[in-house]
Structures are given as structure tokens and as C-alpha cells.
């Protein structure tokens, strides 16, 4: 089996990429990986590109894609090619490249490197259940891998739904070359017969990223270390196609202060949250640049240009970098203090002067003010980070603290997965949940005024949630749950079960 090079001194021009999925909020982890891809490419006189991995059509949204692109631009990252600016390798959305993937999947079948799998989801579930009962690692057992060609053709002709899976060796070890780790050995017995093309004709990440990286001339793939165990599949696909494989570099994952994987349950993870909270883009990019990386002069404060000028990928530490909000706030304060008063004034105006947001706030407070100075009291909570609240703030004559915490947490989970953040969807969700829990709407909404505005005397709270946006709303709701004492593991598990049984409140509208 051919072995990819780990050298950066190749004749091949350096081209790196970031390929976010538009299925949620723009994650700081995306900016972190994008930053190191950009810095590496620029340090070697190369190019950094962006493409959108929107093969999950049930979860991908245009709103999410726009949020991701806007957030990455805001933090200071630019790309040479992408869905918003075009380029010689267009289109840059995977949903617009399905014919390309289908052609390559069929090529693999023709060369006997892949096969059609007709197993139903029920069969696959039963297979996994039996394997787990026997103490085995759940994986596809290859039952369709050796179907006779005539049988396969018959099932296809009958229109039986199927996927395309890749063939993998059943014995031996795959040697993966990684820029930070050297040679990594992964037994083929740990590698599943990966689905490459789904029943809807859309590719999985594994096929799409290999095909796109090749066709877009990507020389170095720098991604999170969670993809290391998938590298054998990708390496095998490059061999099957007869293509030169990009150099691999698996970056350490960002961690919470307790060393767990960075999670929105413990820390805000959205770029837009930090923007709305008042973190400078230069400071956030600087902080992400310090995640597992050190400058040659050990400087703590540096610009993107300074990082690129001295960039060396071997200075990345494999120890899980800790994303600590307190340290980010400290670094942001250093950037703020380095500004002149004039520069600080401009930064404040730039941060607070979102025209659409100000118009929405003005409409909300207009019926409530007599003097322009009244606007300060009515609109302050729209701009603050977290309201100054405590457990006593949530005292309610009809609801216990436990009830309040439960309904806030259930609401939080429901709101996290809204396909579009709008007042209409917020209203439908909360109204449906209140009815489901048999709580009067007035009583149900009272804790939201406290969690979002810090007071029961404020503008309409669902309108306020729409204005401050999903990231800030969800962060304030998580803060409220923490203020009320937080959820223990036993209670959390019980609530998760209850949440899984909730109906789709948007579908009921």
C-alpha cells in the first residue's frame, strides 16, 4: 500500500481547506482549525479555501451557512475560493456536486472496491444489538459484500433501496502517516465497511471529502484528531482511485477546563456568542492561535500576520488545549487596553451599531418610553453578556425551583435544534412545551423574563430572544439553569428521556 508523504517541501503547491457543515451555530472549533489551515498555507506561500459540507440535507440550512461564513470573516479569516466568492473548482457546496460523487462511487463498484448493500435499518439495528450482546464492537458484518452480480442487478432493477459501501481488508494493520504523530498503526479489524453513498444518492463525509480534496488539489488535510481513526478509510480510497494522498495532520481537540471535549453544555462554543458578548475579533483569533501552540518568542499577544510570519506546525502540542473563558477575557482586556481612546470608541460603536438589531430594539421599546433617556433602562439587557441574577430571582408563586429548572432545560434543548431562529418558531416551541407540561403560558414564561432580561419588567421576551439571537439566548438559559443549582447526572438522564419523547411542536403549527 502506498504511503503518503509527511513533507511540506513538496513540488506540489500548498493548498489547505476548511469544510464546515451548515447544521448549527459557527463553532469556535471551526475557527481554530481554519486558523491553523490558513496559517500553514500562507506560511508556505500557498492558498486556503473553504467549501461547505451540506450532504446532511435534513439538518443543513442556508441560515447556518451564512452565519458560519459571516463569523469566520468577522474573526479575521479569508479564503481564496469558496461558495460565496467562487473559484476554479466550483461548485463549493457538496449538495451541488452529487453527480460527481455518484460517478466516483460507481467507479469503485466497477473495480470491485465497493459493493451495494441492501440491508434495512431494522436489519442493521439487529446486527449491532447482537454484536453488542456478544461483547463485540458494532460494525457491518459484510453480509451483502459477496452477493452474486445477478442478485445485485435483480434487486437494483426491483428498486430496492440500497447504499454503496467500500470494501476494507479483514486482517493486517494500516499505517497512517501524520505530521504531528509520525506513523500511526490502526488494525483493519477496527475499520468498518463505510457507507460511501446513501440511499438518497448523497455521499457521506468519507467519499465526498476524498473526492473533493483530490479534485480541488488539496495538498495538506489539517483536521481535528477525532478523524484519525477514519484515516485508514480515506487512505484506502486514495489507493483505490490511484490518486496522490494529501499530507495528514490531526490537530488536538479543544477542551473544557475539566479536560472534557469542548461542549456547549459547559462553555459557550459559538463564535457569534463571543462577538455579541464584546470580544474583539483580534483577541479571539489570538486566543485560538494559542490553543496548543506557542510562538518562538513565547509571546502571548500576537496578530495573525505575526503568527503566519513565524509559523511552524511542529510547535503544535498534542496535549488537549484548554479553552478557558476567563483567560480569553483577560487576553481581550489586554487588547482593549492597548487601544487609544479613539480606537476604543470606534470599537464600541462598531460592536453596538448593528443597524438591524438597533431597529428591532427601537421597535420593541418605542411603546414604553417617554424620553430618549428612558431607552437606556429598557434596552440595556439587549447588550449585556449575562444578567445579574441569583436563585431568588426566580421565586414564583406557582412553580417550584425544580419545575423552573426542568422547563428551562427542556426549552433549551428544544430551542437548540430550531431549523431557523425566528420569533414565530420560538413562540410555537415554547407554547407547545407549556401546553405539553400543562403549565399556563403566563406562568411558563415568567422565568424566561428573568433568564433573558434579568427582570420581569421588560419588552416581550420572545421578541427579545429573537433580537439577541440564538447564541446569546441559549447561553443565558444555560446560565439560568446553573444559577438554579444545575442538573445532576441522575436528573439529567431523566430529563433527556423526557425530552426524547416530546413531539415536534413546529409540526403541530
From Swiss-Prot:
Its EC number is 6.1.1.17. Transmembrane segments: none annotated. GO terms for biological process: glutamyl-tRNA aminoacylation. Zn(2+) binds at residues 117, 119, 144, 146. Catalyzes the attachment of glutamate to tRNA(Glu) in a two-step reaction: glutamate is first activated by ATP to form Glu-AMP and then transferred to the acceptor end of tRNA(Glu). This is Glutamate--tRNA ligase. PANTHER family: GLUTAMATE--TRNA LIGASE, GLUTAMATE--TRNA LIGASE, MITOCHONDRIAL-RELATED. Binds 1 zinc ion per subunit. ATP binds at residue 264. InterPro entries: aa-tRNA-synth_I_cd-bd (IPR045462), aa-tRNA-synth_I_codon-bd_sub2 (IPR020751), aa-tRNA-synth_I_CS (IPR001412), aa_tRNA-synth_I_cd-bd_sf (IPR008925), Glu-tRNA-ligase_bac/mito (IPR004527), Glu/Gln-tRNA-synth (IPR000924), Glu/Gln-tRNA-synth_Ib_cat-dom (IPR020058), GluQ/Sye (IPR049940). A motif ('KMSKS' region) lies at residues 261-265. A motif ('HIGH' region) lies at residues 20-30. One of its GO terms (molecular function) is tRNA binding.
Amino acid at each position: 500500500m502506498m504511503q503518503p508523504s509527511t513533507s511540506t517541501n513538496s513540488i506540489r503547491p500548498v493548498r489547505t481547506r476548511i469544510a464546515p457543515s451548515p447544521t448549527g451555530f459557527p463553532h469556535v472549533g471551526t475557527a481554530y482549525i481554519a486558523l491553523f489551515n490558513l496559517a500553514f498555507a500562507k506560511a508556505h506561500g500557498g492558498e486556503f479555501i473553504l467549501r461547505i459540507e451540506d450532504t446532511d440535507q435534513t439538518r443543513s440550512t442556508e441560515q447556518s451557512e451564512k452565519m458560519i461564513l459571516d463569523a469566520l470573516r468577522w474573526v479575521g479569516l479569508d479564503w481564496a475560493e469558496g461558495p460565496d466568492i467562487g473559484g476554479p473548482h466550483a461548485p463549493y457546496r457538496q449538495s451541488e456536486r452529487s453527480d460527481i460523487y455518484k460517478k466516483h462511487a460507481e467507479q469503485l463498484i466497477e473495480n470491485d472496491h465497493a459493493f451495494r448493500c441492501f440491508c434495512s435499518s431494522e436489519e442493521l439495528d439487529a446486527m449491532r444489538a447482537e454484536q453488542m450482546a456478544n461483547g463485540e464492537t458494532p460494525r457491518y458484518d459484510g453480509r451483502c459484500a459477496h452477493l452474486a452480480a445477478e442478485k445485485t442487478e435483480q434487486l437494483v432493477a426491483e428498486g430496492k433501496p440500497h447504499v454503496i459501501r467500500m470494501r476494507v481488508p479483514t486482517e493486517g494493520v494500516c499505517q497512517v502517516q501524520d505530521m504531528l504523530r509520525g506513523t500511526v498503526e490502526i488494525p483493519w479489524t477496527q475499520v468498518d465497511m463505510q457507507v460511501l453513498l446513501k440511499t438518497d444518492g448523497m455521499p457521506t463525509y468519507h467519499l465526498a471529502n476524498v473526492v473533493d480534496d483530490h479534485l480541488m488539489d488539496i495538498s495538506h488535510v489539517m483536521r481535528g484528531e477525532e478523524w484519525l481513526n477514519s484515516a485508514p478509510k480515506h487512505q484506502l480510497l486514495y489507493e483505490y482511485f490511484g490518486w496522490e494522498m494529501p499530507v495528514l495532520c490531526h490537530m488536538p481537540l479543544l477542551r473544557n477546563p475539566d479536560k472534557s471535549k469542548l461542549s456547549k453544555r459547559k462553555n459557550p462554543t459559538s463564535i457569534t456568542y463571543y462577538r455579541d458578548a464584546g470580544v474583539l475579533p483580534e483577541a479571539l483569533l489570538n486566543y485560538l492561535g494559542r490553543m496548543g501552540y506557542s510562538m518562538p518568542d513565547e509571546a502571548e499577544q500576537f496578530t495573525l500576520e505575526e503568527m503566519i510570519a513565524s509559523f511552524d506546525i511542529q510547535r503544535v502540542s498534542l496535549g488537549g488545549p484548554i479553552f478557558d473563558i476567563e483567560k480569553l477575557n483577560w487576553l481581550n482586556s489586554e487588547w482593549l487596553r492597548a487601544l487609544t481612546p479613539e480606537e476604543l470608541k470606534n470599537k464600541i460603536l462598531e460592536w453596538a451599531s448593528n443597524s438591524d438589531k438597533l431597529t428591532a430594539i427601537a421597535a420593541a421599546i418605542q411603546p414604553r418610553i417617554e424620553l430618549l433617556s428612558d431607552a437606556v433602562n429598557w434596552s440595556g439587557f439587549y447588550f449585556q453578556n449575562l444578567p445579574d441574577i441569583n436563585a431568588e430571582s426566580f421565586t414564583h408563586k406557582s412553580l417550584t425551583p425544580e419545575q423552573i429548572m426542568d422547563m428551562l432545560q427542556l426549552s433549551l434543548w428544544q430551542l437548540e435544534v430550531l431549523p431557523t431562529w425566528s420569533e414565530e418558531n420560538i413562540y410555537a416551541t415554547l407554547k407547545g412545551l407549556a401546553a405539553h407540561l400543562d403549565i399556563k403560558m403566563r406562568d411558563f414564561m415568567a422565568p424566561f423574563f428573568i433568564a433573558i432580561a434579568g427582570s420581569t419588567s421588560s419588552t416581550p421576551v420572545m421578541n427579545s430572544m429573537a433580537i439577541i439571537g440564538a447564541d446569546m439566548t441559549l447561553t443565558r438559559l444555560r446560565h439560568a439553569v446553573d444559577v438554579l443549582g444545575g442538573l445532576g447526572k441522575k436528573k439529567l438522564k431523566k430529563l433527556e428521556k423526557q425530552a426524547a419523547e416530546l413531539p415536534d411542536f413546529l409540526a403541530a403549527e
